[in-house]
């Protein structure tokens, strides 16, 4: 399995799971990064932190550390 921060710009994937042991996992789930949702990496800043994802018809930027707990 890959992590969301490993996507290339323009690449899409479906979320398989969110690592519940990660401190930010509750926040990630609350903002819509839930299993079964399709995400697309739109852009990122220097060093891939933060990353901008398209999900559920909106754009959400999260830190690389948070994207690391999203399994695709």
Locate predicted features:
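Compact, glycine-rich, soluble single-domain proteins
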Residues: 1-72
């Amino acid at each position: 399995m890959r992590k969301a921060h490993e996507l290339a710009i323009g690449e899409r994937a479906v979320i398989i799971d969110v690592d519940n042991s990660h401190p930010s996992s509750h926040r990630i789930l609350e903002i819509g990064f839930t299993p079964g949702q399709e995400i697309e990496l739109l852009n990122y800043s220097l060093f891939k932190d933060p990353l901008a994802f398209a999900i559920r018809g909106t754009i959400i930027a999260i830190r690389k550390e948070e994207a690391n707990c999203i399994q695709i």
